[in-house]
Amino acid sequence: MVLLSENASEGSNCTHPPAQVNISKAILLGVILGGLIIFGVLGNILVILSVACHRHLHSVTHYYIVNLAVADLLLTSTVLPFSAIFEILGYWAFGRVFCNIWAAVDVLCCTASIMGLCIISIDRYIGVSYPLRYPTIVTQRRGVRALLCVWALSLVISIGPLFGWRQQAPEDETICQINEEPGYVLFSALGSFYVPLTIILVMYCRVYVVAKRESRGLKSGLKTDKSDSEQVTLRIHRKNVPAEGSGVSSAKNKTHFSVRLLKFSREKKAAKTLGIVVGCFVLCWLPFFLVMPIGSFFPNFKPPETVFKIVFWLGYLNSCINPIIYPCSSQEFKKAFQNVLRIQCLRRRQSSKHALGYTLHPPSQAVEGQHRGMVRIPVGSGETFYKISKTDGVREWKFFSSMPQGSARITMPKDQSACTTARVRSKSFLQVCCCVGSSTPRPEENHQVPTIKIHTISLGENGEEV
């Protein structure tokens, strides 16, 4: 994946000094390519900072996006500057050894970027198909392993030419040509593009099928909210488990609660955003991976030098446009980008009116507002309150927990109820409520906050039970 093809090097295998550079052409190319490189570097840095500075974006999916941005940042900062100089001067000015290293890093970064998109497509399929099981299927440990596999496979594909898997290099060190050895071209094209592309297309086709099927289910008469958060509802009735010294009234022997399945809207929006990323990736890289194998196996069908350069830089363009796609397609990234650009990163403190958080503690302490024994769980750690609706003066919130076992601990006296309470703070709304319906053992038995799936919480404006 080096800029100059063999077409461009034919007749150039000589040792005399290169021709004089055309100044006007060099300035024009320098401005265009330099602007593209700066835009790509700054844009990918912005993506990384947006995730790093916003804890609600600290999820495995967004870590995959950061990995994609890191690969693109490495490409735009370490490979593209030399590609631009190569294009402007018309010859390679850095020697044979650096040419080989530069070409290997080029393949490494491009392959890591493409495989990163492949991992993201698999992640989105799991998120849309298994939204409730997603936190247990896609864990941070598995995410790290997936990213390590991405970079390991990318390294394997990129280092072949460094160990001699390439055509014989020309004697003139001012020529740094693409590796057109047929075996390596086939291997790299399959591993770097066609296999990941097949996986990406299959995953997104399945995402589309699942999303379409679920949307039909929601429209077929199942109970839904009339708000933006249309959801499937499963109503469950069961008796309370009696507890010694429980402060809960014995009259409430039956608990009526709703377990709402997450609608696919958030997952579908993320899939849509990443679908646009994949679409742009195909448009940018497919021409190159069509031209390169054809030119390697059928030399008589090599495209003109100008066409090859355009196709090659079109592939580079993909690493520069991803930062444009995120804010245009995702409200989360749009707000995160704005915060970073306004230098508001990490300025959200607990006392801020924009803070969102909740505290788990025994019910008796919830009423008094005490802080002893409370467990502060930050937003972005996997536990989130979603505002469902506001009708007739009632605010309804959904509590979703993907808390890993042992991630938070709390000790409760034996005379306390197994009911866990949550204090919600969002702008001017501050209430104390009770989450019911957990089927896990009482907290005092294992000294852990129960792993709560999904609960709906209905409160009046003054916090009264609804």
Curated annotation (Swiss-Prot):
Domain of life: Eukaryota
Disulfide links within the chain: 99-176
Gene3D superfamilies xref list: Rhodopsin 7-helix transmembrane proteins
Membrane topology, from the record: Multi-pass membrane protein
Single GO MF annotation: alpha1-adrenergic receptor activity
Residue ranges, Extracellular side: 1-27, 89-99, 168-181, 298-305
Name used for this protein in its record: Alpha-1A adrenergic receptor
Originating organism: Mus musculus
Lineage of the organism: Eukaryota, Metazoa, Chordata, Craniata, Vertebrata
Gene: Adra1a
